A protein has these predicted regions:
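Conserved helicase ATPase core of P-loop NTP-dependent helicases/translocases
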Residues: 74, 282-286, 291-334
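Conserved two-lobed SF2 helicase motor
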Residues: 84-106, 319-334
Length: 335
């Protein structure tokens, strides 16, 4: 453990000092690494400082920033412009950028855990870069695909929420677990049973199951059929049908479970009851989708459906209020 890290464990330090430690760790990793840092610890500022340092030694350095949403794209462009760093710096949305072959000196990936997905990982393959900086609060993915990012930009430093709270960089908070009993739990159990049967067919291998749907799925199902029943074409055809059936069942049941949990009306009912007894507070709710955010009876709604001007006005009005609610979805979470 470095001396800087030891000091940070025993005595409070400023956020600026900790960010300087992160930058040194990134430089020590030859400028090819990912920074894992809790929300509110200044990941964007770390990136800005790195761009500034590189531009100081090489004013013509070309930087590309990849972000998951247009909202973050706008925020990055605004902040880069305010800091005088927009020259020779481009900000692209990951999905669109994945279809192009770019070349740059420094590649910055915000919400870097996303770039390991099957589609977005093309950004890592297609982009030529000298340095790479990944920024994320959650490096590891449940599907294990974070190993893809780790090949290009392994973790060089981590700022945990515990460290941020200890040093007073973020506001203290409490987590409350609200257990919700739903009358139609049998429906969820049915979805779960179907999911487990399909998952078991693929030997509880998530990557294997996911490879049977989407891109190259036809080829992957045939290869799996030949692996399970080699040297018998007729049996392979029957196995292919079974694989297709269980792959479809796997995806369908997984989506059904997700929708059940995310959109259950009981969640809305309980949330509105909690809000009702806190009408003197300022409350922000985050929903999984726009429909759920719009289902709340009172308060402002902030989603991607409205134009940029309307969203800005909504945030400005909410920020001026002494109390009230702002209902949003992933757009505000990432903003």
């Amino acid at each position: 453990m470095s001396q800087d890290k030891q000091l940070s464990l025993f005595a409070p330090i400023s956020r600026d000092e900790r960010q300087a430690q992160v930058i040194r760790a990134w430089a020590k990793a030859n400028g090819r690494a990912t920074v894992v840092a809790a929300t509110g610890t200044g990941k964007t500022r770390i990136a800005m400082l790195i761009i500034d340092k590189l531009k100081y030694s090489n004013p013509t350095i070309h930087t590309i920033v990849l972000v998951p949403t247009t909202t973050l794209q706008e925020q990055w462009i605004t902040e880069l412009d305010q800091r005088g760093l927009l020259l020779n710096t481009e900000v692209f949305v990951m999905m669109g950028a994945s279809k192009h072959n770019y070349k740059c000196d420094l590649l910055i990936i915000d919400e870097a855990h996303r770039v390991s997905s099957e589609v977005l990982s093309a950004n890592l393959v297609n982009t030529q870069f000298r340095y790479i900086l990944g920024l994320t609060a959650t490096f590891e993915r449940l599907d294990g695909r974070h190993e893809i990012l780790a090949k290009y930009a392994p973790v060089c430093d981590t700022i945990t929420m515990e460290e941020a709270l200890f040093n007073g960089w973020v506001t203290k908070y409490k987590d409350y677990v609200v257990v919700i009993d739903v009358p139609d739990i049998d429906t969820y159990n049915s979805y779960n049973s179907e999911f487990n049967k399909a998952y078991e067919f693929f030997n509880w291998d998530f990557d294997k199951a996911m490879s049977m749907v989407g891109k190259d799925s036809f080829k992957n199902r045939w290869e799996y059929a030949k692996e399970l029943v080699p040297n018998n074409y007729e049996h392979q055809k029957e196995m292919f049908k079974s694989i297709t059936y269980y792959a479809t069942s796997f995806m369908r049941s997984m989506q059904n479970r997700k929708k059940f949990v995310q959109n259950h009306p009981k969640k809305l009912e309980v949330a509105q009851e909690i809000i009702k007894w806190r009408n003197d507070k300022k409350i922000v709710t985050f929903s999984a989708n726009v429909k759920m955010a719009e289902s709340f009876k009172n308060g402002y709604v902030y989603t991607g459906k409205e134009g940029k001007k309307k969203n800005r006005i909504t945030l400005e009005e909410f920020s001026k209020m002494p109390n009230g609610c702002l209902h949003s979805c992933k757009m505000a979470i990432e903003g």
